[in-house]
């Protein structure tokens, strides 16, 4: 599929009337529904399974259905359809037959944003964590933003809430071009790399979409871009040349306007024209230090005093599936990460290495999408070779059909001596056999590899003395 940069006119919540969500149990869909319910919009929704978040939405006042049926639409005046909803879904077919407006999740979220000062976080990697950090930092500084995040955040308790201020913080997903539906006042871009080429077709189209995104910023807005990332840095330079908005850069680069020093845990600080300020971070990794610097920059743009901003992340423990601690057994600590791009795998393994110290790092990786594996097989292998052992599962297909000649073997053939392919039924045993006390185990990928973390912890505990 090639990219379309057509932008939808932003609707108001009032214009939508009663809203029905098809696929309401998804992380992104439930976030929008939660905000709409809190803002007084009559909401109903359905999903194929009875997911935990649906009980929360029902308790908040939404009408919830398990299973899909045309009758679930009720008196809906607008419909929001999740990206995984098929064209033959009976509710979607009924909505179209009735002439109801059918919105993408991003269009519904844009309607919820209308009238607020909007902060969006975009980028190939780090969106969920950075959006979470911005939200936690603003809350810690005494503000109460509305927020919508594409991951569950233990520090916040939920992935979305309607706040009392006029600030709206949201993750902006570039994977299908839908981030062009937002109208941000502050736009953070953590990095820009070719990805989602199944949608965009070419790397150039990816870069063009980010240019279109920054063109949405008003004259009194600001682009906050990472000076350490070549793609984000080039975007900042093009935006400055275009001159439609201000640009603020952050990072360890000498010319970054907000300069980051990352000396490891306990030695992270940023310097601005107002001085030098320590960042109290509990999450490891250079990538998280950069994410924190971006959040700090946003806080300053919103008028938060630097001293108030610097300590506000002390209790941030990370977002779900972002180097998330799953447990420990036999002295081996197990973490899980959503990393599904070579850059993300490198960052997650670097964080694991910083935690492991002199001990070993073992990774169980599940490639995500045939198209991504074909495009980045060599880069994945290079990234995985940073681990002491790397076990690679079969590709998680998600929305794709198989591509002839594309399998995990494309990665496996390029792994160093510590790496090999592993069958799903052998994965837990193989990981446990590799790990010794003090080591770190990382499960990585955007598919169901996340289910292996608890199983590995359970197996390690069974082998522990008294287990």
Swiss-Prot record:
It is found in: Cytoplasm. It is an enzyme of class 6 (ligase). It comes from Arthrobacter sp. (strain FB24). InterPro entries: Mur-like_cat_sf (IPR036565), Mur_ligase_C (IPR004101), Mur_ligase_C_dom_sf (IPR036615), Mur_ligase_cen (IPR013221), Mur_ligase_N (IPR000713), MurCDEF_pg_biosynth (IPR050061), UDP-N-AcMur_Ala_ligase_MurC (IPR005758). ATP binds at residues 123-129. The keyword Cell membrane does not apply. It comes from the Bacteria. One of its GO terms (molecular function) is UDP-N-acetylmuramate-L-alanine ligase activity. GO terms for biological process: cell division; cell wall organization; peptidoglycan biosynthetic process; regulation of cell shape. HAMAP family: MurC (MF_00046). The keyword Protein biosynthesis does not apply. This is UDP-N-acetylmuramate--L-alanine ligase. Cell wall formation. Its main location: cytoplasm. Belongs to the MurCDEF family. It catalyses: UDP-N-acetyl-alpha-D-muramate + L-alanine + ATP = UDP-N-acetyl-alpha-D-muramoyl-L-alanine + ADP + phosphate + H(+). Keywords: ATP-binding, Cell cycle, Cell division, Cell shape, Cell wall biogenesis/degradation, Cytoplasm, Ligase, Nucleotide-binding, Peptidoglycan synthesis. Pathway: Cell wall biogenesis; peptidoglycan biosynthesis.
